[in-house]
Amino acid sequence: MFKKIFFTSLFILSMDSSAWWDTGHQMVCDEAYKLLNPSAVKALDPLIEEHGSFGRACLWADWIKGERKDTRSWHYINLSDSEKDTYAAKCPENGCIIASFYEQLNILKDKNTSFSKKEEALWFVGHFAGDIHQPMHAGYPEDLGGNRHFLKFENGKNTNMHKLWDGQIIDHMEFVHGKDYLLDNVTSKIKIFLGIDHSHEIESWAQESRDIAMQKS
């Protein structure tokens, strides 16, 4: 029951979010934590104790990219302009977000996995749930997932498509409407999905992001 409630709350919260700097990742994971029942909280707490909260734990995957360079490619899947579909078979040898998501889920579910590996797996899963719903994380290698697609946003400031989706949209919405507006917009849609396992939908989420990337970039 812990797994079903945890994965449902995490994945459904991330489905309606669209920007993933620290604010987005932390908001989704903290709100997912609030939906857990007492037994699920008891199971999760030891795995996030090092960070003090699940929201903070979900930022860890970005913090370690400089030190653990092999994990950088785990955050996205880039396909050429001619390729419309995303699936795990297209991942390069060094991995992509779809394959890495499944790998970390399997580690987390494996009863024989060491505690330290379960910790990291949970932190990765929490982070990837956000990244996989960011369209530029399913973009094109030619423009580095939107990093070379330049534009202007808010008072004519220079930016790029990846930064826009990754955090500037949510920062702008939070400034204009407030954080409570963002949370209410997402959490109001969740209850009907609780109790359903959504962990098998990873590839469809990546495909949705790919479809948006192809329309918007």
Residues covered by each model-derived region:
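Extended hydrophobic/aromatic-rich secondary-structure runs
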Residues: 1-2, 103
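Sec-dependent signal peptide recognition
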Residues: 2-8
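N-terminal signal peptide c-region/cleavage motif recognized by signal peptidases
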Residues: 14-16
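N-terminal, motif-rich segments that launch catalysis or mediate targeting to/interaction with membranes
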Residues: 18-128, 135-217
